[in-house]
Swiss-Prot record:
Transmembrane segments: none annotated. Mg(2+) binds at D96. PANTHER family: MOLYBDENUM COFACTOR GUANYLYLTRANSFERASE. This is Molybdenum cofactor guanylyltransferase. Transfers a GMP moiety from GTP to Mo-molybdopterin (Mo-MPT) cofactor (Moco or molybdenum cofactor) to form Mo-molybdopterin guanine dinucleotide (Mo-MGD) cofactor. Its cofactor is Mg(2+). GTP binds at L9, A10, G11, K22, D70, D96. Pfam families: NTP_transf_3. Monomer. Belongs to the MobA family. The lineage of its organism: Bacteria, Pseudomonadati, Thermodesulfobacteriota, Desulfobacteria, Desulfobacterales. One of its GO terms (molecular function) is metal ion binding.
Length: 202
């Protein structure tokens, strides 16, 4: 398997959580970013954390990066992460998917080939660009879009060689697709805690 950098988009303050950094919200005794970090690190060869407040992560064994453009957004975070990646390919994850499965990451990474720029899961609801592999070759196209103020990740795909991973293949290793469960609000965090306590998820 190719050497791959793991990149976590940690962001910063979350208004939907009522302020504070949602990456450090506790879930079943661990922060959300701890859960994501440990899963990604178990598969990837080195780590990058992209954060608005990188000083919060000084104790972590990871390269720390921050946005290089004045405006914020996931595409800006992807750009910052790829700029700091130690390998040609990087697996990118958001910090708010605490049930991300190692097997899902391996399945996505397994789609890497020299002629492919992006490997992205595609469920019936659409693609999952924040649980995907990107080549550093994407940087030129991403920078062009950012300089033009174009922030939609999927719009970048039109200029890149993209391989999708089908929902069928994803369900083979994650039947309930819990890897893609985003925790964006206090209510969703409470539902996740309840699911863990009920033994429906771990």
């Amino acid at each position: 398997m190719d050497a791959v950098t793991g990149i976590i988009l940690a962001g910063g303050e979350s208004r939907r959580f009522g302020g504070g950094n949602k990456a450090f919200r506790m879930l079943d005794g661990r922060t959300m970013i701890d859960r994501v970090h440990d899963t990604v690190k178990s598969v990837c060869d080195d780590m990058v954390i992209v954060a608005n407040t990188p000083l919060d992560y000084l104790g972590w064994n990871a390269v720390l990066a921050t946005d290089l453009f004045d405006f914020r957004g996931s595409l800006v975070g992807i750009h910052a992460g790829l700029m700091s990646a130690g390998h040609e390919y990087a697996f990118i994850s958001a910090c708010d998917t605490p049930f991300l499965k190692q097997a899902v990451i391996k399945t996505i990474i397994g789609g890497i080939e020299d002629h492919i720029d992006v490997v992205v899961p595609e469920k019936k609801e659409g693609m999952e660009p924040l649980c995907a592999v990107y080549s550093r070759r994407c940087l030129e196209v991403i920078e062009r879009h950012l300089h033009q103020g174009r922030m939609v990740i999927k719009a970048v795909y039109n200029k890149l060689r993209v391989r999708t991973i089908s929902e069928k293949r994803l369900r083979a290793v994650d039947p309930d697709l819990v890897s893609f469960w985003n925790i964006n609000t206090k209510e969703e965090l409470e539902k996740a805690e309840a699911a863990i306590k009920a033994g429906r998820i771990s």
